[in-house]
């Protein structure tokens, strides 16, 4: 049975002269997900910063088989530095950073997700909660 929903949004504007920084969206994701049956695999994906990122918000998106979602710096002096972690796929924390978390141009952000595929089927990327995802959303501004 079809139903119609409604969504409302309030947009607040300011004068262009009052803008200090223009926010950009973080959308780091991987569709290359293949979880073998009855296993607990950890997948990693790396994303290199193409500009200096002053990150002021991060949150993960994944589905029901996710048991841990970590975001770290990979390589260099900050190797292994934890930026974000979630153990709750349904209600991931939205982390806000003030002052912003700085990731320099050329540094690598690593997504590391651990899944528990308790089923007898291989699970892949997909839109249903019984499929899986590995996405990092957030917001930043560049210098």
What positions do the PLM features span?
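Beta-strand-centric surfaces of beta-sandwich/beta-rich domains
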Residues: 1-143
């Amino acid at each position: 049975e079809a139903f119609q929903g409604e969504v409302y949004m309030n947009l607040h504007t300011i004068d262009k002269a009052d803008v200090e920084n223009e926010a950009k969206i973080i959308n780091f994701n991987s569709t290359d997900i293949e979880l073998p049956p009855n296993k607990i695999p950890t997948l990693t994906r790396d994303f290199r910063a193409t500009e200096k990122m002053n990150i002021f918000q991060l949150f993960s998106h994944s589905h029901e088989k996710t048991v841990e979602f970590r975001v770290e710096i990979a390589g260099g002096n900050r190797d292994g530095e934890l930026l974000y972690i979630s153990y709750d796929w349904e209600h991931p924390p939205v982390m806000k950073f003030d002052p912003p978390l700085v990731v320099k141009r050329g540094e690598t952000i690593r997504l590391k997700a651990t899944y528990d595929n308790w089923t007898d089927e291989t699970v892949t990327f997909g839109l249903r909660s019984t499929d899986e995802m590995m996405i990092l959303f957030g917001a930043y501004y560049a210098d």
